[in-house]
């Protein structure tokens, strides 16, 4: 019973309850537990390697670091200085290398891929905070999962990412069609970012 009440509280706080039918992301509040995988490749695009019943560091259900950007940053679950007492986890994104030309990148593959429709507007909301090293911005968009990396939409969150939790909202319009795109978040400077209660919906 306590677990059910906690999940209800989490859904209410993150705004997921009202968007349950339209939420496009998998594990948007980072509360989902990772499960060990035996004799299979982890990740929707074959990322990772074969495991013997254990998970490597940085595995968070629904979230990946795209190929080619693995050396620039790492992701992990954080349980400290959380957004609210109802939250048990947040995403810690430790960025060691990043610039405007070569930003650090993380992606969410959606529940069954993210359908992108040309001309449709999407809204991305998220809570974020940063350590004192991070002076950059956060950009977000929809990108092809194929090797060509086609961008269907992209926008940058307004305002600096501060030391205290703050909510940000980004809207963008898709410029192409894709049955199974992914949400991509980019950061253009080194530092540590914390994200929680993210949400992507189609308007």
Task: State where each predicted segment sits.
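Bacterial Sec-dependent N-terminal signal peptides
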Residues: 1-22
């Amino acid at each position: 019973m306590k677990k059910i009440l906690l999940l209800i509280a989490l859904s209410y706080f993150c705004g997921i309850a009202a968007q349950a039918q339209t939420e496009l992301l998998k594990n948007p509040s980072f509360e989902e537990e990772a499960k060990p995988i035996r004799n299979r490749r982890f990740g929707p695009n074959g990322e990772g390697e074969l495991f013997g019943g254990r998970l490597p560091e940085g595995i968070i259900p629904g979230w990946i670091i795209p190929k080619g950007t693995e050396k620039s940053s790492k992701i992990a679950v954080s349980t400290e200085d959380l957004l609210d007492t109802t939250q048990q986890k947040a995403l810690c994104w430790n960025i060691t290398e990043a610039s405007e030309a070569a930003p650090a990148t993380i992606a969410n593959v959606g529940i069954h891929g993210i359908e992108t429709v040309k001309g449709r507007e999407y809204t991305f909301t998220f809570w974020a905070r940063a350590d004192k090293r991070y002076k950059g911005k956060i950009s977000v968009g929809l990108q092809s999962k194929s090797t060509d990396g086609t961008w269907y939409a992209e926008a940058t969150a307004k305002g600096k990412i501060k030391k205290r939790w703050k909510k940000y909202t980004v809207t963008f319009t898709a410029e192409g069609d894709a049955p199974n795109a992914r949400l991509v978040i980019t950061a253009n400077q080194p530092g540590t970012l914390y994200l929680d209660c993210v949400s992507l919906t189609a308007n």
